[in-house]
């Protein structure tokens, strides 16, 4: 998946998720990193990292994407999109017990695309706050 397609997909997903939901809080960061003398990856590498996290009444979401480029022009994109749905907020019931404040349906889409291979993993389960 190309970077433009990935960015458009994430923007569409974020917009659809928050059309009717004003964020209680949200945070965005953009970080650039350049390094030399790596032993495991290309000797010189530039990495751009985008992160976004937000909480709305019924859910929260965390997203990050690393776009890496080596001096040999090898490119790689890795991202994770992790929305969680609050069962307490959806049901209107207090689901707190002991140190647990809420029970959530937790999901993650992790994906990697580079010059050699790519993968998509979809994870789901129960989460606790």
Residue ranges and their predicted role:
Residues 22-53:
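Outer-membrane beta-barrel initiation region
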Residues 28-32, 52, 63-65, 103-107:
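Membrane-embedded beta-strand positions of outer-membrane beta-barrel proteins
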């Amino acid at each position: 998946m190309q970077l433009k397609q990935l960015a458009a997909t994430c923007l569409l997903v974020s917009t659809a998720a928050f059309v009717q939901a004003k964020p209680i809080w949200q945070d965005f960061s953009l970080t650039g990193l350049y390094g030399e003398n790596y032993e495991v990856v290309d000797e010189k590498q530039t990495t751009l990292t985008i992160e976004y996290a937000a909480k709305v009444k019924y859910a929260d979401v965390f997203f990050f994407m690393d776009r890496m480029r080596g001096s040999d022009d090898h490119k790689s994109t890795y991202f994770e999109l992790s929305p969680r749905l609050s069962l307490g907020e959806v049901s209107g019931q207090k689901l707190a017990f002991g140190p647990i404040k809420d029970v959530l349906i937790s999901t993650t889409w992790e994906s990697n695309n580079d010059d050699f291979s790519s993968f998509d993993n979809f994870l789901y389960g129960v989460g606790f706050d």
